[in-house]
Amino acid sequence: MKKILCVGYRDWALNIYKKIAKNYNGADVTIVSSHDEYSDSFVRNYNPDIILFYGWSWIISNSVVNNYKCIMLHPSKLPKYRGGSPLQNQIIKGEKDSGVTLFFMSARMDAGPIIFQETMSLSGSIDDIFERIEELGYKGTMQFLKSPTKGVEQAEEDATYYKRRTKDQSEITLKE
């Protein structure tokens, strides 16, 4: 039985994980939803085949990244908008469309091989955007679980980087 460790605390990530647990037969799915629950020793003891880090903001140790198949979801069309606060940074830059990218984690931030990428609109409320992220994240994850791939390397020459915005910097008021 395949063991899948799902790590994340955001509602949209937890919704993806719950759907995977319900719909992916033949898997032992464990969900970790707080920083206090997650540790390298927990990962070693559980010994998962795959770790999903969706909606997770803390640094993951090199020992976990190097010894397990770790997949991350990033709400941009990587390699664009690597780094923190991708949604806020895209909206501030005037982007109308974004994407959901699933990729294998590597030692470099948001730079691993892409296993799924699909465009999504940034229109509507933040809840509308989170709903799209959830839908595409689930779609991409199930696609990967059913037909694993090694992924496609990112085009480094197209990479852009952004810093995480503070809570105050992340409050965005859009004008009609």
Predicted regions and their residues:
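One-carbon transfer enzymes
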Residues: 1-176
